[in-house]
């Protein structure tokens, strides 16, 4: 894109983009009115939450925990005990794929679909007709209370969905 003849960013150049080391493909601007520089990650963690913290000036000495093999039994046991519901999945998954693969069983059994991703996140998917959104939010609050210390994930996310198999759809109620 940057080598295209149609790439024209006069305002960004005026702010200093063309003066950053490595941006020699841009025409230099004479009257720079902004501050500029090249940044490098400093935090140990590399997920979305840590990145946002770092943009705000907080450098994290420790990475947030991730769960490439799913969450530990003790976490899920406590979650099930406090919510009164068993869980399905417990592994890294795409949000659309997880409801495709586990949605019918969730609707049939009422078990919550718990999954993660490459980031430090605990996600709970549930059909809105089986688990109303407010109840799903309560389950997220319970998960957040459990997920502290060693298992203090960056985010706990509600992932409500609607519809019928095989056409489940995630909603914006999250």
Whereabouts are the PLM-identified features?
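Short, Lys/Arg-enriched charge-dense amphipathic segments
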Residues: 48-50, 109-119, 132-143, 174
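Extended, H/D-rich, highly charged conserved domains that either
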Residues: 125-174
């Amino acid at each position: 894109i940057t080598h295209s003849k149609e790439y024209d960013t006069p305002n960004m150049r005026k702010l200093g983009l063309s003066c950053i080391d490595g941006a020699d493909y841009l025409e230099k601007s004479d009257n720079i009115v902004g501050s500029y520089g090249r940044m490098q990650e400093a935090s140990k963690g590399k997920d979305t939450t840590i990145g946002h913290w770092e943009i705000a000036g907080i450098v994290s000495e420790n990475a947030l925990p991730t769960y490439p093999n799913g969450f530990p039994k003790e976490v899920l046991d406590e979650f099930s005990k406090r919510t009164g519901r068993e869980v399905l999945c417990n592994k890294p998954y795409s949000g659309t794929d997880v409801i495709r693969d586990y949605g019918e069983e969730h609707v049939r059994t009422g078990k919550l679909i718990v999954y993660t991703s490459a980031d430090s996140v605990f996600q709970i998917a549930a059909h809105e007709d089986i688990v109303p959104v407010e109840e799903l939010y309560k389950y997220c609050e319970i998960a957040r209370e459990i997920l502290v210390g060693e298992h203090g994930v960056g985010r706990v996310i509600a992932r409500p969905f609607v519809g019928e198999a095989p056409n489940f759809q995630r909603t914006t109620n999250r």
